């Protein structure tokens, strides 16, 4: 399966039990900042934004004072899982980032999608990739 198929079929799909509800944007990005696959709506990010995200995975709490920035959008960092998941909130939407062995799985959402639904979609794929050694 191509990386693009993972994004299209497992991240940008309808949320279980909520037909028509899906993430706003999603991507799989290598830990070096190279985009493996992304939705058409995923924001163009700056290298320093990706560096900040990787630093937060290695030094949990790094982004808390400044916020998480992606594509020029600032998210308030909320409870995640140190070294494994970063979650951010902005208004009625937010972001979930799951770290795997080699990549980062991104999901961005707006209402009516809930934070929990975004977490479920992103973390399920991230856990699967981890199980596959990726």
Swiss-Prot record:
Q: What is its main location?
A: cytoplasm
Which parts of the sequence carry Phosphothreonine? 114
Q: Which GO terms describe its cellular component?
A: cell cortex; cytoskeleton
Give the protein's recorded name. Answer: Profilin-3
Looking up Pfam families in the UniProt record yields: Profilin
Which cysteines in this chain are paired by disulphide bridges?
13-118
Q: Which GO terms describe its molecular function?
A: actin monomer binding
């Amino acid at each position: 399966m191509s990386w693009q198929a993972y994004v299209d079929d497992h991240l940008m799909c309808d949320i279980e039990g909520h037909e028509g509800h899906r993430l706003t944007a999603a991507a799989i990005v290598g830990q070096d900042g190279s985009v493996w696959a992304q939705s058409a709506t995923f924001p163009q990010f700056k290298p320093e934004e990706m560096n900040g995200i990787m630093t937060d995975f290695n030094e949990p709490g790094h982004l808390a004072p400044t916020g998480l920035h992606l594509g020029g959008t600032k998210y308030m960092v909320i409870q995640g899982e140190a070294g494994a998941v970063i979650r951010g909130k902005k208004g009625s939407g937010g972001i979930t980032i799951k770290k795997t062995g080699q990549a980062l799985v991104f999901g961005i959402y707006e209402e009516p999608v809930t934070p929990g639904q975004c977490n479920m979609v992103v973390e399920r794929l991230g856990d699967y990739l981890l199980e596959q050694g990726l």
